[in-house]
Amino acid sequence: MSTRREFLTTALAGGAAAALGPRRASAAPKSMSVVHESSFIKAFDDYFVKTLSPEYEKLTGIKVAYEPVSVGSMLTRLTTIVETKAGPEIVHTGINWPHLFDQGLLDVTDVAGEVGKKIGPWHDNILDSVVVNKKWKAVPWGNIGQLEVYRTDWFKEVGVTKFPDTWEDLLAAGRLLKKKGHPFGFELGHGFGDNHGWMYPLLWSYGGREVDKDGKTVLIDSDETAKAVDFCRRFYKETMLEDVLGWTDVNNNKAYLAEQISCTNNAMSILIVAKRDFPDIAKVTDHGLNPQGPKGRFHLYNPQSHAIAAHAPDPAAAKAFLRWLYDDKQLSRWLVAGDAYYAPFLNGYDNHPMWNVD
């Protein structure tokens, strides 16, 4: 079974005073709020609400409210916050959202720089997601890595003893498994993570791309894209449950744990929940790399970050909270509480003990 490590591959203008961290002050706000999409790992949310928020209130007198948003709804919530200039001042962003909401988010280059100096440096691969026009618009706390999740026992029943290395080999295995009553289930609906978590890598593995390296020249209409789409059509028709067309990110988790499917792409959440609630399923669950296509093997980054909304009434207080939250004393505990579901983009965590817990 894959180990967790395998599975995942500057101060405020106040200077020295800011470096001392959060402190009580007569002008400090009495409260602030953070909006987050609900995590697939409930303990991650619970740790913030039950441990981190009370600790910060005890330290500073500032109560930090935590607003959970249902899975798949964060982008809509963020759009409303930015357009109405109202709501929580600290917001959850995903993937490339800082680029979409550039004008609605404050510059947090100083915070990111300080965090990078203390527990970094930052991995270079995060910069394209959160740095907009040379300014950090969000501070990442981790990546939600994805692999292929599959039932080793059912694969063995059809003679497949290791996870297929190419898309065509996975298609062949899927045909056999579907005939045995163990179809695949890859999300093809209007989700937000699992659909593009496998479809972008599939597109890239055939040489397709949306735009050129300049980020402007549109290249999606190509022979390579057509080949990827044709494979996707066959993959769906010959291996999957029909209702994947209406799935969102929660459906494949539920289907796998209900033993309705033998393979899907997912983060660690399926295995984490299986180990807790379905130990017999966990024993026969493993992970494989995304298959190769004619142009190689690819995976998609899914960075999760905090940003400060432009309407924040006290940007200095919001930054002070993020500095405290991203201090190793807090951040490492939070990540561990979440079963290392999120892999930070900070070199200081590359060899953290949490990666050795299976």
Q: Where would I find each of the regions flagged by the language model?
A:
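Paired acidic/hydrophobic, glycine-rich loop segments that form the ligand-binding mouth/hinge
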Residues: E89-H92, S262-A267
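C-terminal lobe and pocket-closing loops
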Residues: S269-A282, P294-D358
